[in-house]
């Protein structure tokens, strides 16, 4: 009996301490919000609370459709994607642009020529394009891809790695242009879900029951592996054949505006010290 009473007493004191800790956190959050609203300096105990600084949500409002740049077209209309390159592209980058164009069923490829970026963005907006993809290179090797959504963003900047074109793969044959099935694997964080939102809206919505084409975006350590396969059902099961292109992408910058807006708010950016922080995945 005495042991049980002592245990119940300890449990009561523990629950009471948790309630007091939570009440203290709520009070500090209210003080922080009041200070932010009034512009007054923070109390010292609140300003020095490192745990509060990590856990506080400065904006606890629920995201509505009005905050979603894709709500107007999501699941309703097919995207109009424009694929182009940096100016004066090499033969290999031009070939890669053709293959990227085939990757997205409703896209068109644009020979940029000497068009400057503001004029290119203006032309896309005038033609009611939904997205612009710009491919970049270094000495003939594709190195970067920029995806900008119209009319108000966001714009995602990816570095490209291990790019293998279709004609570098054996026995690829002709590429099917039917609407593909999409697989997004291992995107677990809010940033990862944001990247999925950007990528999936480059493809037409709807069910693709009769399509034998599959495009996979697999996140492994913040490197997004892009693979395209076609499958054939046999008596023994399902046979897969890779048809390319094949490459890895890594997000290094995400902005809320469109491509030509250099003053757009930065939603996320990879800093230099993040390259050595191998223990943390951001996607």
From Swiss-Prot:
A GO molecular function held by the record: snoRNA binding
Keyword Acetylation applies: no
Family annotation (PANTHER family): U3 SMALL NUCLEOLAR RIBONUCLEOPROTEIN PROTEIN IMP4 (PTHR22734:SF2)
Name of the protein this chain belongs to: U3 small nucleolar ribonucleoprotein protein IMP4
Keyword Endoplasmic reticulum listed: no
Domain of life from the UniProt record: Eukaryota
Name of encoding gene: IMP4
Gene3D superfamilies, sorted: Probable brix-domain ribosomal biogenesis protein
Keywords assigned: Nucleus, Ribonucleoprotein, Ribosome biogenesis, rRNA processing
Domain Brix, chain residue ranges per copy: 79-260
Known partners and oligomeric status: Component of a heterotrimeric complex containing IMP3, IMP4 and MPP10.
Primary localization: nucleus
GO biological process terms held by the UniProt record: rRNA processing
SMART domains linked to this entry: Brix
Alphabetical list of InterPro entries matching this protein: Brix (IPR007109), IMP4/RPF1 (IPR044281)
Subcellular location: Nucleus, Nucleolus
GO cellular component: Mpp10 complex; nucleolus; small-subunit processome
Function: Component of the U3 small nucleolar ribonucleoprotein. Required for the early cleavages at sites A0, A1 and A2 during 18S ribosomal pre-RNA processing.
Xref: Pfam families: Brix
Lineage: Eukaryota, Fungi, Dikarya, Ascomycota, Saccharomycotina
